[in-house]
Each structure stands twice: as C-alpha cells, then as structure tokens.
Amino acid sequence: MSAVRPLRPERQAQKQARGAAARLSGRRAEVLAALWLMAKGYRILGFRLATPLGEIDLLAQRRGVLAVVEVKSRTSLEAALEAVTYEQRSRLRRAGAHIAANRAGLRDAVVRLDLIALAPGRRPRHLLNAWPNTGNDGQ
C-alpha cells in the first residue's frame, strides 16, 4: 500500500471552495423547496433536521401526512431520483418513523418520502411518495 499524499495548498483551497459553493447551493435549493411547499399548504417543521438516524433536508406536514422531503438540484427529475440511493431512502424512512414516534402530535401521521427536484430555469417538481415502501424499495 502506498501512503496517501496530502493535497497541494492550492488544490486544497480549490476543493474547499467547491465544497463551500455546493453547501450554499444546497441551502438555497432547500429554502426554495420550503417556499414551494408552504405555497402548497405545508407547514415546515424542520430544515436540515438532525436525527440519530441521519439528516433530513426538510420535514413538512399537511393534514395527516408527515413528509420527509429530500431536495435535489439536478438537470432532470430522473437524475434527481437516481441521486438518492437505496441506503439513503432506508435511512430517511427510518428517520421519519423515529420523529413521528417521538413527537407528540405526529404519532398518528402517515410518514411519506417526497422528492423536490430543482433544475435551472424550471419550476420545482414535487414528487409525492417518490419511493413507495414496497418491501424491496426499488431494488
């Protein structure tokens, strides 16, 4: 095995700048998605919500539904759907169930995994129940 060489300072700075730009872009996408959901009558319960099972981009509620919303900024809806792996879907499903079970007022809510796909120059696409729990979760 060879040792991993550290990045040159200029490469490290470029990598950090790309990471910062990606985080800012992600936050902007989440704010836009939250505004879209609020316009559709959802109440936003949390942004980048940390749970023992992982982070949820947006947690929203409307009527008896608790929507665990994954936000993806991609060129197409298909690319956004493909960007969320089986492991991520499983983690999101468990995190949503954990929140519903541990928060008063949400115990009877139906937990649903939604996707909001954002693409440059297009309206946000809100895909309800993007990954139905079919037992094999699309595998």
Curated annotation (Swiss-Prot):
**InterPro entries tied to this protein:** Restrct_endonuc-II-like, tRNA_endonuc-like_dom_sf, UPF0102_YraN-like
S-S bridge residues:
none
Q: Which Pfam families match?
A: UPF0102 (PF02021)
- What Gene3D superfamilies would the database entry show? 3.40.1350.10
Under Gene Ontology molecular function, one entry of this record is:
nucleic acid binding
* Name by which UniProt lists this protein: UPF0102 protein Caul_0175
SUPFAM superfamilies membership: Restriction endonuclease-like
**Belongs to which family?**
Belongs to the UPF0102 family.
| Superkingdom | Bacteria
